[in-house]
Amino acid sequence: MSITAVYPGTFDPITCGHFDLIERAARFYDRLVIAVADNRNKTALFSLEKRVALAKEVTADMPNVEVIGFSGLLVDFVREIDGNVLLRGLRAVSDFEYEFQLASMNRKLAPEVETMFMTPAEQYAFISSSLVREISALGGDVSEFVHPVVAKALNEKQL
């Protein structure tokens, strides 16, 4: 049986923390789909198309990784692409309560889909897209926290 994992998020922008999780997860799943969400509840810095393009560039050398933009209910998207696993990252204990609630709701909506949690490597645990956006907006150097193509896109956005 082939296992397809789906790693959802807004990835606004995709960070080294995201990439670390993607790189490690790609070793365990036959197919890993990075599901870039068009979240109407959040105001994104980058358009959905740009976020998908950046994630594709960052993961270009990973043959079993696909990047797909989506809108709507996550479990519907997972079913659409024949996904088996929802992959979620936990940076800190504070993430757990929300993620546990989400996993429980997703299990209720799609009992055939399992949720798996991964923690980041220690050097990435403090990185978040919102902090990267804030540092960049204030003129700070984010090159340590994002892939060079993402840093370039952030710099261009601030001009």
From Swiss-Prot:
<comment type="subunit">
    <text>Homohexamer.</text>
</comment>
<protein>
    <recommendedName>
        <fullName>Phosphopantetheine adenylyltransferase</fullName>
        <ecNumber>2.7.7.3</ecNumber>
    </recommendedName>
</protein>
<dbReference type="GO" id="GO:0015937">
    <property type="term" value="P:coenzyme A biosynthetic process"/>
</dbReference>
<feature type="binding site">
    <location>
        <position position="18"/>
    </location>
    <ligand>
        <name>ATP</name>
    </ligand>
</feature>
<keyword id="KW-0547">Nucleotide-binding</keyword>
<feature type="binding site">
    <location>
        <position position="42"/>
    </location>
    <ligand>
        <name>substrate</name>
    </ligand>
</feature>
<feature type="binding site">
    <location>
        <begin position="89"/>
        <end position="91"/>
    </location>
    <ligand>
        <name>ATP</name>
    </ligand>
</feature>
<feature type="site" description="Transition state stabilizer">
    <location>
        <position position="18"/>
    </location>
</feature>
<keyword id="KW-0173">Coenzyme A biosynthesis</keyword>
<comment type="function">
    <text>Reversibly transfers an adenylyl group from ATP to 4'-phosphopantetheine, yielding dephospho-CoA (dPCoA) and pyrophosphate.</text>
</comment>
<keyword id="KW-0067">ATP-binding</keyword>
<comment type="pathway">
    <text>Cofactor biosynthesis; coenzyme A biosynthesis; CoA from (R)-pantothenate: step 4/5.</text>
</comment>
<feature type="binding site">
    <location>
        <begin position="124"/>
        <end position="130"/>
    </location>
    <ligand>
        <name>ATP</name>
    </ligand>
</feature>
<dbReference type="InterPro" id="IPR001980">
    <property type="entry name" value="PPAT"/>
</dbReference>
<dbReference type="GO" id="GO:0005737">
    <property type="term" value="C:cytoplasm"/>
</dbReference>
<dbReference type="GO" id="GO:0004595">
    <property type="term" value="F:pantetheine-phosphate adenylyltransferase activity"/>
</dbReference>
<feature type="binding site">
    <location>
        <position position="99"/>
    </location>
    <ligand>
        <name>ATP</name>
    </ligand>
</feature>
<feature type="binding site">
    <location>
        <begin position="10"/>
        <end position="11"/>
    </location>
    <ligand>
        <name>ATP</name>
    </ligand>
</feature>
<dbReference type="InterPro" id="IPR014729">
    <property type="entry name" value="Rossmann-like_a/b/a_fold"/>
</dbReference>
<dbReference type="InterPro" id="IPR004821">
    <property type="entry name" value="Cyt_trans-like"/>
</dbReference>
<keyword id="KW-0808">Transferase</keyword>
<dbReference type="Pfam" id="PF01467">
    <property type="entry name" value="CTP_transf_like"/>
</dbReference>
<keyword id="KW-0548">Nucleotidyltransferase</keyword>
<keyword id="KW-0460">Magnesium</keyword>
<feature type="binding site">
    <location>
        <position position="74"/>
    </location>
    <ligand>
        <name>substrate</name>
    </ligand>
</feature>
<dbReference type="GO" id="GO:0005524">
    <property type="term" value="F:ATP binding"/>
</dbReference>
<keyword id="KW-0963">Cytoplasm</keyword>
<feature type="binding site">
    <location>
        <position position="88"/>
    </location>
    <ligand>
        <name>substrate</name>
    </ligand>
</feature>
<feature type="binding site">
    <location>
        <position position="10"/>
    </location>
    <ligand>
        <name>substrate</name>
    </ligand>
</feature>
<comment type="similarity">
    <text>Belongs to the bacterial CoaD family.</text>
</comment>
